[in-house]
Design a protein with these regions (language model features):
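Short active-site loop at a secondary-structure junction
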Residues: 69-82, 102-167, 203-215, 284-287, ...
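Short solvent-exposed beta->alpha transition segments
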Residues: 457-503
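Exposed beta-sheet edge and beta->alpha loop/turn motif
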Residues: 496-548
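Short, conserved catalytic-motif segment at the N-terminal edge
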Residues: 54-116, 136-138, 149-153, 189, ...
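Short, gly/Ser/Thr-rich active-site loops of penicillin-recognizing serine hydrolases
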Residues: 334-336, 372, 399-475, 544-548
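Short, well-ordered beta-strand elements
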Residues: 387-390, 394-404, 520-524, 533-540
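Short, surface-exposed loop or secondary-structure junction motifs
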Residues: 88, 98-99, 155-375, 380
Length: 548
C-alpha cells in the first residue's frame, strides 16, 4: 500500500526524530537491556555511550555455535569471543583449550589473555592522534623529521618522503612484510636504528597506493617515543590502557593466577606444537599487546561510541571517528590457503564482499552493501589469530580470538557479526535513515501543488535563483504538462505525495499519481540557513528527467 505523506504528518515525524519514510515505532533498534547470560556488564561510568543494544539469547547461541564449530573443524585448540555495543560487552564466552595437556592445562574463556597482534595498531594510531591533538606533532610532516634514520629508497627516483599520515594509512610505499615483521617484536632501539640506517626500500611511490606495512607502524612507534619522551609501551599503557581500565599488557603477566593462552601451530604428523612468547621491543607498536576478548571488546566499544558523541576517555570523539574513516582504498585480495595442513575454517555461505574497503588510522574500513560501514582489524602472530569488527551506525560488534597460527578467526567474526546485525535488522533497520529538514518537507508540499497547478509566484518563492537560469519557468511548465499527458492526466489525488524517500536531510523524492501512471518529483535544498530548492525535477516514473 503506498505510503501517504502530508506536511503535518511529516513535520510531526521530524519533530519526533523519525527518519523519512519510517513509522514512529522503528526509530530505535532495541528498547530494553536484555543482558546475557553468564557474563553481565555494569552500567558504564562517566556518562552514556549511546544506545545500548539488546541481542537476543538465540542470536548469542548462534554466535557461540560459530566458534565451537570452528574448533570442531580443527582450526585451533581454543577460542574466546565477545559481542559488544557502545555500552560495553553484551555477552562473551569461550571454548576449547587455552593450554593443552599438562598440569597447567586450562579452558579458554572471555577473560583469557591472547596475543591480539595487529589489533594493537589501533592503539598506535590513537597514540599519534592524541599527540597531534595536544599540538605536539603534525601528521603531514615526513616521518624522518622525527626518525632521521628512516629515509627509504623510492622507485623511479621520486623525491617523496613518507609522512606520518601516509604510514598511518598504509600508503607509505613500503612493501607487505608480515612473515618477517611478526618475528621481530623484541628488536631493540639500537638494532632498529641500525636497520633503518642500512636502508629500506619502497615498492611504490609514497602516498599513491595501499600496501600493508608493519615496518611503517614500527617507525610510527618510534615517533611516539621521541615525541612523548617515554617508551611506546609506557605511553600507551599510561594514556589508554590504565584510564580505560583495560586488562591488557605488553608483557606476559607474571601472576600465576593470570589466565594466558598458549599459542600453537599445527606440525605435520605431530598435532599442535606450542610456540614460545616474545617480549616487548620496537615492533610492539605493530602487534605487541595481550588482551582478553572482554577487554578488546571494551576498547572497540569505546571507539564505536565516538559515533554517539561520547567524549569519555583520553581521545576525543572526533579523532576516534577519524580513525574509522576510509582514507586509502585497498584492492580486495583473495585469502591465502591455510598452511601446514590446517583445515580450512567454515565460511558463511552467504558472505558478501564489501562494496569498497581500505584503511583509516589503525583500522580497516569496509562498506557492506547491506549494512553500510564496518570498522575492523585482524591480528596474526605465531600461534595466535585475533579479529575485532563493529558496525559504526549501530555500535554492534564482535571480537574473536584463537590460539593457532593461520587460524583466520576473522572469518568466524565476520559471520558472527552478520548474524547479530541480521537479527537486529529483523526488528528495526540497524542503519538509521536520514531525516529531512522541515524546510525540505515544506518545499515538497509547495512543489507538489506547483506541479498540479503552476504559478510563477509560487515557484519564485520556493526555488533558488539558479533554477530558472538552468531551465526557464515557461519551459518547465510545458514539460510538466507534457508529463501529465503521458500519465493520462491529473486525478483528485494528484497533489498528495506518496512513497517519499530521501538520501540526505536536504533531499526528498516523492511521487504524484496520475490516471495511468505517476510522476516522480525530486528536490534538493541549498546549504543556506534559510534553504531553497536548488534542484527541482519532474518526470514520468521510469523516464528521463524534465527539469534540472
Amino acid at each position: 500500500m503506498p505510503q501517504k505523506m502530508c506536511a503535518n504528518r511529516q513535520q510531526n515525524q521530524i519533530a519526533a526524530g523519525v527518519p523519512c519514510g519510517r513509522a514512529t515505532g522503528a526509530r530505535d533498534i532495541l528498547v530494553s537491556n536484555l543482558r546475557l547470560v553468564r557474563w553481565l556488564r555494569p552500567a558504564p561510568a562517566g556518562g552514556s555511550r549511546g544506545s545500548n543494544m539488546t541481542v537476543a539469547a538465540d542470536t548469542i547461541q548462534a554466535v557461540e555455535a560459530v566458534f565451537t564449530g570452528r574448533l570442531a573443524a580443527g582450526t585451533a585448540p581454543g577460542s574466546s569471543w565477545a559481542v559488544f555495543d557502545r555500552g560495553g560487552v553484551v555477552a562473551a564466552g569461550g571454548s576449547g583449550d587455552a593450554e593443552l595437556g599438562g598440569v597447567g592445562g586450562a579452558s579458554a574463556g572471555p577473560e583469557t589473555l591472547f596475543r591480539i597482534a595487529s589489533c594493537t595498531k589501533s592503539f598506535t594510531a590513537a597514540a599519534l592522534l592524541l599527540l597531534r591533538d595536544r599540538g605536539l606533532l603534525d601528521l603531514d610532516r615526513p616521518a624522518r623529521s622525527f626518525v632521521p634514520e628512516f629515509s627509504p629508497e623510492v622507485p623511479g627516483g621520486f623525491d617523496v618522503a613518507p609522512t606520518l599520515h601516509m604510514l598511518m594509512t598504509m600508503s607509505g610505499g613500503l612493501p607487505t612484510d608480515d612473515p618477517w615483521a611478526d618475528r621481530e617484536e623484541s628488536m631493540t632501539r639500537e638494532a632498529f636504528r641500525a636497520l633503518l640506517t642500512a636502508g629500506v626500500r619502497c615498492t611504490s611511490v609514497p602516498g599513491t597506493a595501499f600496501e600493508y606495512s608493519n615496518l611503517g607502524y614500527a617507525v610510527l612507534g618510534q615517533v611516539v617515543e621521541r615525541v612523548a619522551g617515554m617508551a611506546f609501551t609506557e605511553f600507551v599503557s599510561r594514556e589508554f590502557i590504565e584510564p580505560l581500565g583495560l586488562d591488557m599488557h605488553f608483557e606476559r603477566p607474571g601472576d600465576e593466577g593470570a589466565a594466558v593462552a598458549t599459542g600453537y601451530r599445527r606440525a605435520d604428523g605431530e598435532g599442535w606444537r606450542a610456540l614460545p612468547f616474545t617480549g616487548p621491543g620496537v615492533f610492539s607498536a605493530i602487534g605487541g599487546l595481550f588482551a582478553s576478548a572482554r577487554s578488546l571488546a571494551e576498547w572497540a566499544g569505546w571507539l564505536a561510541a565516538a559515533w554517539a558523541g561520547d567524549e569519555r576517555g583520553p581521545l576525543g570523539s572526533a579523532s576516534r571517528r577519524e580513525m574509522q574513516q576510509l582514507m586509502r582504498v585497498a584492492a580486495k585480495r583473495p585469502s591465502a590457503a591455510p598452511a601446514n595442513g590446517t583445515p580450512a575454517p567454515p565460511v558463511e555461505p552467504a558472505a558478501v564482499l564489501p562494496l569498497v574497503s581500505g584503511y583509516g588510522f589503525g583500522l580497516f574500513v569496509e562498506h557492506d552493501e547491506r549494512f553500510g560501514p564496518i570498522a575492523s582489524h585482524s591480528g596474526g602472530y605465531p600461534g595466535f589469530s585475533a579479529h575485532m569488527r563493529w558496525h559504526t551506525a549501530s555500535g554492534l560488534g564482535v571480537v574473536a580470538l584463537e590460539n593457532a597460527t593461520y587460524a583466520k578467526v576473522s572469518q568466524g567474526a565476520e559471520q558472527a557479526l552478520r548474524l547479530v546485525l541480521a537479527a537486529a535488522e529483523r526488528r528495526s533497520p540497524v542503519t538509521p535513515a536520514p531525516v529531512p529538514w522541515p524546510e525540505t518537507v515544506e518545499a515538497s508540499v509547495a512543489l507538489s501543488r506547483l506541479v498540479v497547478d503552476w504559478s510563477d509566484a509560487t515557484a519564485s518563492a520556493v526555488l533558488a535563483t539558479n533554477v530558472p537560469l538552468d531551465v526557464p519557468f515557461e519551459e518547465r511548465r510545458s514539460a510538466i504538462e507534457a508529463a501529465w499527458l503521458d500519465v493520462g492526466g491529473r486525478t483528485a489525488e494528484s497533489a498528495t505525495p506518496v512513497d517519499a524517500r530521501c538520501d540526505s536531510p536536504n533531499h526528498l523524492v516523492w511521487f504524484l499519481p496520475g490516471v495511468s501512471g505517476r510522476l516522480r518529483v525530486e528536490v534538493r535544498m541549498t546549504p543556506l540557513a534559510a534553504p531553497r530548492a536548488q534542484t527541482f525535477t519532474v518526470k514520468v516514473d521510469g523516464s528521463a528527467a524534465s527539469g534540472a
